[in-house]
Amino acid sequence: MGRMFGTDGVRGIANKELTADLAYKLGKAGAFILTEGTHRPKILVGMDTRISGDMLESALVAGILSVGAEAICVGVIPTPAIAYLTRKYNADAGVVISASHNPVEYNGIKFFNKNGYKLSDELEDNIQALIENNFKDVPVLTGENIGRKIEEDGEAIRDYIDFAKSTIKGDLKGLKVALDCANGASYITSVEAFKELGAEVHVINNKPDGININRNSGSTHPEDLIEYVVKNSCQIGLAFDGDADRCLAIDEKGNLINGDFILAICGKELKKQGRLKKNTIVVTVMSNLGLDIAMKKEEINTIKTKVGDRYVLEEMLRNDYAIGGEQSGHIIFSDYNTTGDGLVTALQLAHIVKESGKTFSELCSIMKELPQVLVNAKVPNDQKDIYLKDEEIKSEIDTITKNLDGSGRVLIRPSGTEPLVRVMLEGENQGEIDKLAHGLAKLIEKKVK
């Protein structure tokens, strides 16, 4: 069997790939591995608004209870809320049933350890090994040793809203905000937090029906929010994904503001407050070169990691950095939470807009995004490193890099799931880099034939 866990837990089409049987096994194995040696462990369970959530929750919880753990079910709640509340409630682990920004037919199961962090590869492998070994040496419990399910009555949502509000000083009175909840897990928390802080709140896509999560809405489809912000003269628009661990923004002119701009604006603000540890932000190799250029002007360092918020977080923890994230809107504020948190990000941005006295578009002028071109080159899986070995390809990359002369770059990334490498070029001239990227992709394809 291949590796069960992907970069963000176990994910697949619900009832076909991610079945109730698999959810039961994950609950049983996860509870056993994560709570070994604890007398009566507590595991927090939350989910997004997908129709398959109830089915998977029932199965997952059955697995948790079968090994003697208690399952505290908090219902529909954002992923970052589970990360935070696992710590706050001194739970032994947390689990979220969600497929984030994916369409409704997908679902996923993601574990957090007792400190609110995603699991290490090693722990995930231990969970998978236990399932594959058919739960060898796991005792069969009976009678009073079986765990209980505890239905939580709304306190968790209240605690998370209070926590999110506490991450800004002051209020948002006088700010006109539009929120797009993607018909997902943030449909209560984000709206309440902004209202309680005094903002004038306008909301779209906050009526989940089990099947409309992420449908033409949220951070993956911000078109409706863009139109809404402009039409209703809002000062800022904020779009969440299905489980609200990411956030993208819209300025008052209707421009989409991605995670690079959010990192630039928040990084500058943290520096101003003397809270930007080591004067550094953590980004991935896919962040726009324009962010590096902007941060250099602000005398802020950028550290680059592999793509994926787990790698950003690893780097932040290793060197105690305060902020990091991705273009997609996964932004991590290590002073506040242990994972990307859409609501915390949204509140920081809104607060900066209010306190600055500037328009959001003026704040975004901190950075000029360089044109970026991405071309896929088809390459057999066993030849994905050809760009590191072939002399002609290496020479072409060097020539392009030299010609871009510091105002652009070449980045080649092998796909982790498909037989291709991604050729990415950035530079000031869109036409020029488009031609160069396609030329380089063709050369790579020619060399593997």
From Swiss-Prot:
The active site is at 100 (phosphoserine intermediate). Activated by phosphorylation. GO terms for molecular function: magnesium ion binding; phosphoglucosamine mutase activity; phosphomannomutase activity. GO terms for cellular component: cytosol. The keyword Isomerase applies. The keyword rRNA-binding does not apply. Binds 1 Mg(2+) ion per subunit. InterPro entries: A-D-PHexomutase_a/b/a-I, A-D-PHexomutase_a/b/a-I/II/III, A-D-PHexomutase_a/b/a-II, A-D-PHexomutase_a/b/a-III, A-D-PHexomutase_C, A-D-PHexomutase_C_sf, A-D-PHexomutase_CS, Alpha-D-phosphohexomutase_SF. Mg(2+) binds at residues 100, 241, 243, 245. It catalyses: alpha-D-glucosamine 1-phosphate = D-glucosamine 6-phosphate. Its EC number is 5.4.2.10. The modification Phosphoserine is found at residue 100. CDD domains: GlmM. Its cofactor is Mg(2+). Disulfide bonds: none annotated. Keywords: Isomerase, Magnesium, Metal-binding, Phosphoprotein. SUPFAM superfamilies: Phosphoglucomutase, C-terminal domain, Phosphoglucomutase, first 3 domains. Belongs to the phosphohexose mutase family. Catalyzes the conversion of glucosamine-6-phosphate to glucosamine-1-phosphate. This is Phosphoglucosamine mutase. The gene is glmM.
